Design a protein with these regions (language model features):
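Conserved active-site and cofactor/substrate-binding residues in soluble primary-metabolism enzymes
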Residues: 26, 30, 59, 63, ...
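Active-site C-terminal subdomain of aminotransferase-like
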Residues: 102-197, 261
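Active-site phosphate-binding strand-loop segment of PLP-dependent enzymes
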Residues: 18-79, 83, 96
Length: 279
């Protein structure tokens, strides 16, 4: 499918010495210079990257978007793991935002959720997809048919899961988007403080620590593969490679702080983790 025909990866890098040094995104000056030199049609970035627990701040996103717009391209932001750290597309310059139901929205995994800027909506009409299931222009036509009061069919939809997603999105809206964002920030800070107080070091460097995905170093394979937490009734995610030229002995474990239950009950969420660490 030649998706894409060519690609350049701007890797994160360590910001210190030692085998448990923290990691930060590629310096923004280097990213901007590469965009201006290579003139890509699209720049993809993860808002929150889940192997490292790293978040790209709004000013970083804005600088990337401005640079790619200068050369006639567009910016695509992966927000699947953003949790309740909402992204303002207009303020950051993001053209295409992609997310999903199953993390911050507390929904069932059933679809992709795609938001388009005015420029992206205009550009998509001139594209042809090489995929049937992932033909974004076709799905856009389906959506716009329904919005106009009509009916159209492309593939069978996971209707029940979509209805559940709609319900939980309405629940979050009624509770307050800003309120739940503040809960996400507070819970992430509390969990990171808990880990650091026990000498557990963060993979993400200061200034780039995501509040919804906390990735920390370990030297214990039973923590890395989540078996020790599972034995205590907690589900964590196994650590995975960064694929950024990390040392051979790189080992981590991941804690996802997603879902309204965790966010609305931060004290309980932190206490459960603390009890597991003390066991």
């Amino acid at each position: 499918g030649h998706i894409p025909s060519d690609s350049i990866v701007m890797k994160a890098r360590r910001v210190g010495e030692g085998n448990q040094a923290a990691w930060a995104p590629c310096p923004i000056e280097e990213v901007v210079a590469t965009i201006r030199a290579e003139k890509p049609a699209l720049v993809f970035a993860p808002h929150v990257e889940t192997s490292s627990g790293m978040l790209l701040p709004d000013d970083y996103l804005r600088a990337v978007a401005d640079a790619v717009h200068e050369v006639g391209g567009m910016m695509v932001l992966d927000c699947v793991a953003s949790g309740a750290i909402w992204v303002n597309m207009e303020a950051t310059g993001v053209d295409v935002l992609v997310t999903a139901p199953q993390k911050g929205w507390s929904g069932s995994p059933c679809c992709a959720m795609v938001c388009l800027s005015a420029a992206a909506r205009k550009a998509i009409d001139g594209t042809t997809s090489s995929s049937y299931a992932c033909d974004l222009k076709k799905w856009l036509q389906i959506m716009e048919s329904y919005e106009a009061g009509g009916h159209a069919y492309h593939a069978t939809m996971p209707t029940d899961a979509l209805v559940r997603l709609r319900e939980v999105m309405q629940e979050t809206r009624d509770y307050g988007f800003e309120k739940v964002r503040a809960e996400q920030v507070a819970l992430g800070a509390a969990v990171r403080e808990l880990f650091e107080s026990r000498g557990i070091r963060s993979v993400a460097a200061d200034g780039f620590k995501a509040p919804g995905v906390v990735v920390s170093y370990t030297t214990d394979p039973e923590i890395q593969n989540s078996k020790k937490f599972l034995a205590l009734g907690l589900q964590t995610a196994a650590g995975v490679p960064l694929q950024c030229d990390e040392p051979a002995d790189f080992m981590s474990f991941r804690v996802g702080l997603f879902g309204l239950e965790k966010l609305h009950n931060p004290g309980r969420s932190v206490a459960q983790l603390a009890a597991a660490l003390d066991a």
